[in-house]
Amino acid sequence: TAADSGKIFFINIASGMTLTLPSIADGVALDGWNCKVVIETNVSSNTFTITEGANDTDVIVAHTTENQSTASGGAPAGTSTGCTNVILANGADVVGDRFDIVCSGTKMYVNAMVDDDAAVTVS
């Protein structure tokens, strides 16, 4: 909700969950809204998903910063200029992976900082 701005959420759910962001389309003033999400328990089944509000369409702009890359040296999959979901895959996360989220009033900017380049995807 809009009241959650500035909070830090620690995720301790091994079975995964979905975090729904406040909806920009609902008309609530969200300019400057922000939060941080920190993974404290590995997601061992399902996924951890950050999703936009129900009335929004492709308002998430996602970027991934990774600590390591595979031998093939591929780019992180978790980068998008407009998407609905940012997904942290089960088994690819590391305790301490985090997401910084800030709203401009028209977009939700999600910066994922993860250990593994295969950990984050967007859709």
Predicted features along the sequence, with ranges:
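Short proline/glycine-enriched turn/loop segments at secondary-structure junctions
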Residues: 86-90
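Surface-exposed intrinsically disordered loops and tails
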Residues: 66-84
